[in-house]
Every structure is written in structure tokens, then in C-alpha cells.
Amino acid sequence: MCKVKLGEVAIEHKETCKGNKDGYPIVGLEHLVPEEVTLTAWDEGSDNTFTKMFRKGNVLFGRRRAYLKKAAVAPFDGICSGDITVIEAIPDRILPELLPFIIQNDELFDFAVGKSAGSLSPRVKWEHLKNYEFELPDMGKQRELAELLWAMDATKKSYQKLIAATDELVKSQFIGPLAHKDFSGHTAPMRRCA
């Protein structure tokens, strides 16, 4: 393990869409879910003012109001808000599959909040974010960590789907049968609680 700065293993991806935006998914801050490492929402269409490009595998970091902990890996190429910093792994220094988990962690967000400027809508710049220091293992261990973390993320998502399905089942079993009943004229006495 060695201590590295984020800017030694990743760069800010700076690419601008100068032509037609048709066909590119659009990502705004509202699409980044706090504390989620994967991007699951975006808009389609070209009716926006965004011009910042990102590529599949880049990490999209919500630089405005960093305390909201918004950062996710892009599953496709697209265009994003100027309030998103696009971070690209340097593959011979850090495994690109591990970078999203390095970014999406409390210590990095605490660092980002401490380096943010502005009172109403504080923003952190890449120039400050790139100085975040962390321990980084060798490539073999990075691969092991990435596999484990992605497996944990998949398990978490499966669990969330199970909870949602269970919630729907409970609603259908208890609320559904009562939805078509006529309760007019049937009242229960009310008591005042002190």
C-alpha cells in the first residue's frame, strides 16, 4: 500500500460537445443519487445548455453541494451539467473499476466539503479535489477489492428490489381488497388523547 493523491491516479476529463447533441443521454445533478455508485437515471433529448462530455467508465462527481454525496460511474457516453466534475482513471495507476468506490466515500466527501467555496451553493474545484490523499494497494489487490465491492453493490441492489417487491405485495394483500369496499355510514367513535 502506498499513499497517493487523487490527481496522481485520475484526471479531470475535459471534453466539450460542439456539435449535435442528439442521441446523447443527458445527466444533471438531479440524476445523481446520494451515496449510490451507479448512475440509474438520465434524460434523453437535446433541449438543454449542457456541453460537457463524459465517456463510459468516467466517474461523475457532483461538485456543487458536495455534502449531498453525489458521485456515480457512467455506464455510457453522454453530456452532463457543468456542476459535475468528470473524473477519468489513469489505468496504469488505478484500476478503473475501483475508482468509483474511491470517489464515493465519506472521507473524500468530507475533504470536498472542506475545500468548497461559496455560501449559497458551495462548489469544489478539481484543483482542490485532486489533492485528496488515500491508501492505494497494488493492482492485484485493487482487482480483488473492485470485484468484492461490485459484488456487494449488486447484493445491495438485489436486496433493495426484494424490499420494493415485498412492499408491493403487502400493499396488494392489505390495501387492494379494501379499495373497493363501501364504508359509507360506518364510523368509529373518536377519543381525545391527552
Please annotate each region the language model reported:
Residues 1-17, 131-147, 154-194:
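Non-catalytic DNA-recognition/assembly elements of restriction-modification systems
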Residues 4-17, 22-56, 190-194:
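Sequence-specific dsDNA recognition surfaces
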Residues 50-52, 59-104:
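A short beta-sheet element
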Residues 64, 78-85, 117-140:
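A short glycine-rich beta-alpha junction/loop motif
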Residues 70, 123, 128, 148-151, ...:
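Residue-level recognition of specific faces of alpha-helices
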